[in-house]
From Swiss-Prot:
Lineage of producing organism: Eukaryota, Fungi, Dikarya, Ascomycota, Saccharomycotina
Protein known as: Mitochondrial inner membrane protease subunit 1
Gene (name only): IMP1
Effect of D138 to N/E: Abolishes enzymatic activity
Effect of D131Y: Abolishes enzymatic activity
UniProt entry keywords in alphabetical sequence: Hydrolase, Membrane, Mitochondrion, Mitochondrion inner membrane, Protease
Known outcome of mutating S40 to A/T: Abolishes enzymatic activity
């Protein structure tokens, strides 16, 4: 070894550290690939083995629109994350539970007086629900979600229960795009 040169293992270690730092920055600020569990987003996402692609440039609610699927910190337990669909934006009037007047969500008793009532979503908050309303703990339970808890927008998912290859390049491991399902009826009628 000559003066001023590093052994090959030292260069390899240096490249590995740089790569890890780069991946950490991407994970923190740009993109995340994470698992989802639970029945609240059926049929959009499976109850198990669905992994979602999350874009973090939508963090803190930046650019979020009605109908987008998001990942957020759970307001009642910041150590857990939730995956829900935005069904109300700041200033919107939302019906607390449009599906039924039952006062149970799963096994959890929910305040019966709130059902059938309208709530105005406060500024800086969004109203979120699961696609499977009968099995979802969401804004109907913990009220409007502060936009500061939003970690990103879900744009796609992979279901690892599916075979790796089913003959289509578009369907590797059950890949699917997660679309915004909101249809603005007022805008369409004008």
């Amino acid at each position: 070894m000559t003066v001023g040169t590093l052994p090959i293992w030292s260069k390899t270690f240096s490249y590995a550290i740089r790569s890890l730092c780069f991946l950490h920055i991407i994970h923190m600020y740009a993109y995340e690939f994470t698992e989802t569990r639970g029945e609240s987003m059926l049929p959009t996402l499976s109850a198990t083995n669905d992994y979602v692609h999350v874009l973090k440039n939508f963090q803190n609610g930046r650019g979020i629109k009605m109908g987008d699927c998001i990942v957020a910190l759970k307001p009642t337990d910041p150590n857990h994350r939730i995956c829900k669909r935005v069904t109300g934006m700041p200033g919107d009037l939302v019906l607390v539970d449009p599906s039924t007047i039952v006062n149970y969500v799963g096994d959890v008793l929910v305040d019966e007086e709130r059902f059938g009532t309208y709530i105005k979503v406060p500024e800086g908050h969004v109203w979120v629900t699961g696609d499977n309303l009968s099995h979802s703990l969401d804004s109907r339970t913990y009220n409007a979600l502060p936009m500061g808890l939003i970690m990103g927008k879900i744009v796609a998912a992979n279901n690892f229960d599916k075979p790796f290859w089913d003959g289509s390049i578009r369907n590797i491991w059950g890949f699917k795009w997660i679309n915004n399902t909101f249809l603005d009826v007022q805008a369409k009628s004008n």
